[in-house]
């Protein structure tokens, strides 16, 4: 499937969310859809696999900015194509992830309800999502997208800077902090 880009609308999807801070299965899961987080910006951060080396460094770094995203009416959602129980076990058993307080999501569906497939970032040769970041406005329109090689991590500070720039509605030169 062709990758969606700036200006494209995110349509119907359903993923299983692991609630912020959850470490046990009791009440840990909630379905997240295109209708969730009404009126909010969504920062959707795909990573390839749980229990890997680069992925937790990104999740922890993004999570350190979770309150900054919230201050901007944005919800941080990090996820992969591993299932929700894998995510919960990883969070509960990883010293750094154990301290995170943001949403994780499991995008295990294939076909029309898969968010990774809809956005065009499911990479079949690896059986995983590419390392992609989408900033989606409250109307579910994609306003920013970046995709990295599976082996290369991202800069959460740059994602926050781009969100700030998008929310101003003004021109924003290179490296300008908002």
Question: Whereabouts are the PLM-identified features?
Answer:
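Chalcogenol-based redox active-site neighborhoods
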Residues: 1-178
């Amino acid at each position: 499937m062709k990758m969606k880009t700036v200006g494209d609308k995110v349509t119907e999807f359903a993923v299983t969310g692991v609630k912020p801070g959850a470490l046990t299965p009791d009440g840990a899961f909630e379905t997240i859809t295109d209708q969730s987080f009404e009126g909010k910006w969504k920062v959707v951060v795909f990573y390839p696999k749980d229990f890997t080396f680069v992925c937790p460094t990104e999740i922890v770094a993004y999570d350190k900015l979770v309150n900054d995203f919230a201050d901007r009416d944005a919800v941080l959602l990090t996820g992969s194509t591993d299932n929700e129980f894998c995510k919960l076990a990883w969070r509960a058993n990883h010293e750094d992830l154990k301290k995170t307080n943001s949403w994780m999501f499991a995008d295990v569906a294939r076909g029309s309800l898969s968010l990774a497939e809809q956005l065009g970032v499911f990479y079949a040769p690896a059986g995983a999502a590419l390392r992609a970041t989408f900033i989606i406005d409250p109307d579910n329109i994609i306003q920013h997208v970046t995709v990295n090689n599976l082996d290369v991590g991202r800069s959460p500070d740059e994602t926050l800077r781009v969100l700030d720039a998008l929310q101003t509605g003004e021109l924003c030169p290179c490296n300008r902090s908002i």
